Amino acid sequence: MDEQRSKALSAALSQIDKQFGKGAVMRLGDHNAIKDIEVYSTGSLGLDLALGVGGLPRGRVVEIYGPESSGKTTLTLHAIASCQAAGGTAAFIDAEHALDPGYAHKLGVDLENLLISQPDTGEQALEIADMLVRSGAVDLIVIDSVAALTPKAEIEGDMGDSHVGLQARLMSQALRKLTANISRTNTLVIFINQIRMKIGVMYGSPETTTGGNALKFYASVRLDIRRIGAIKKSDEVVGNDTRVKVVKNKVAPPFREAEFAIYYGEGISRLSELVDLGVKFDIVEKSGAWYSYQGERIGQGKDNARQYLKEHPELAANIEQRIRAAAAGHPLAFAEEVAEPAAVG
């Protein structure tokens, strides 16, 4: 760049700094411009690895969607527990009025320090979220769910009144306000969303998410969570096998997936994941029904191996450390890249 243009650029940058504050425009190579992405764990080791950065990124909008009872709220409660364990403050905006405090406590959530709001309208919920973000004192906010963010006009209207596009407009306006503040305060905002079926779709997926298209664009990470099977003990169903696809990721390569077990009353079983991922990486040996680690048998069947690791936390920590090291060396081995899924919406 010639000297005259360089001076003109310096003058412009100086004027921008004066008017909008220092750091309004930066060179990407500047030391302060590039920050390591801070994350909160999802509670699933496999999903943390599939996300590419070790968890859900702070300073971003994340959308978690899926059918009913697929584990959406469980995933967010694990993230809240992770945030609180790191000394952070978390808030849960319960638009569905369905949070189970007992279950949250079992997942490691500190209920005494969890901020909770049960708003009457969608506008109130999103305004509360915006105020918490702008405070800069809250590290993680969960909004459960987009489908329950009912516009005030709809609540005050009569049954059967048409309110086409109201919720989509509400979400679009709120996200325009929220995103800049979220980035500035480094707050992680998670929206839980439900799935609906589009009528008259002949080709492609008929599934779509509620609340219009704004959230699809503003979300840095979108997770599609599905129940893929039941976990049985004798004849009793004690949990679900769950698969999560990373359908959008602006902080790492997308389209990876992870599978894990969710046990009723217990949440995501990290120990079951250690056994499965350990076998995948040849860290845990499997011979028939027996699992072994470094030549020592740790259990016959996954349940017994899981129980053994529960009783020997130092061994579990060692296996986890080796899995993380192996995943760093083989980024696609832990969760195979899948074909790009049909776009939802």
UniProtKB/Swiss-Prot annotation:
**What InterPro entries does its record include?**
AAA+_ATPase, DNA_recomb/repair_RecA, DNA_recomb/repair_RecA_CS, P-loop_NTPase, RecA-like_C, RecA-like_N, RecA_ATP-bd, RecA_C_sf
The listed locations are: Cytoplasm
Gene3D superfamilies, alphabetized? P-loop containing nucleotide triphosphate hydrolases
Provide the binding site for ATP.
G66, P67, E68, S69, S70, G71, K72, T73
- Note whether Manganese occurs among the keywords: no
Q: How far does the signal peptide extend, from start to end residue?
A: none
GO biological process terms, semicolon-separated:
DNA recombination; DNA repair; SOS response
Gene Ontology CC entries for this record: cytosol
Q: Which UniProt keywords apply?
A: ATP-binding, Cytoplasm, DNA damage, DNA recombination, DNA repair, DNA-binding, Nucleotide-binding, SOS response
CDD domains (UniProt xref): RecA
As one GO molecular function, the record gives: single-stranded DNA binding
Recorded family membership: Belongs to the RecA family.
Provide the function of this protein.
Can catalyze the hydrolysis of ATP in the presence of single-stranded DNA, the ATP-dependent uptake of single-stranded DNA by duplex DNA, and the ATP-dependent hybridization of homologous single-stranded DNAs. It interacts with LexA causing its activation and leading to its autocatalytic cleavage.
Name it. Answer: Protein RecA
Q: Which organism is it from?
A: Acidithiobacillus ferrooxidans (strain ATCC 23270 / DSM 14882 / CIP 104768 / NCIMB 8455)
